Amino acid sequence: DFDPVIDNALDAGNPIPEALQSRAELRQKVRNCADFKPLPAEIRSLFPSEFEETELGWVPKGWSFTALKNFGKIICGKTPTKSNKNYYGKDFLFIKIPDMHGKVFVTNSHDKLSKLGSESQSNKIIPHGSICVSCIATVGLVSINAQDCHTNQQINSIVPNSPHYRNYLYFSMLEKYKIFHDLASGGSATLNMNTSVFSNIATLMPNNLVLKQFHKITEPWFEAILLNEYKLTSLASLRDTLLPKLISGELSLEDLPDLNTDTEAA
């Protein structure tokens, strides 16, 4: 969103590139509305008042396009051999595409690795707070791992060089859904975006002050989402424990006094 830069350029009387003229005109109409509320001065001061041209188009002065790998280490997941059952257990999440659907944060996974399984591919461990992107078959799902984990080979993960890159990268990857699909369409029936292609995707790099402020503003939202996700995981676990016992008759509602109390109160 270049609106703060356009605002600054308009106020400073700086020229707007022809390619951005239509956006500037729309922005000016918004600014002329009676109920227009400008961004706080301290936020606008983080943005430049000029644009500069790059090979990939116009960007705010001081910003640039760079390969995704320059934001952090890219790790392609791997599946430990199934022939060694000791590699699987309950110590580490082993994230696969079904675990990512509808999740901003992944807090649980259907399969898990043991400590031994993790150690068998220690170079594939994904530190918590990384951005996981599905790149084979179902392409373009984006999630954040809530704890150190592993993924299978259908997922590439970005380990941010700095914690304040995380939230920006999450939204940036969501916006690249169509780009991911275009890059993964190689003529075969199955979509496949390999790690090399993924690592070199051009990604807009704002200045560091903007990235830090963006993280500061958005982090409370992410913290609330993560807390809710843990609550949902806990409730799902409780459901999966109690429901079979209720269906089989091993338990009845009378055996759950807290539930009865809550129901009566409602």
Predicted features by range, described:
Residues 1-4, 9, 13, 75-79, ...:
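A generic secondary-structure signal for well-formed alpha-helical elements
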Residues 133-134:
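A generic structural signal for residues embedded in beta-strands
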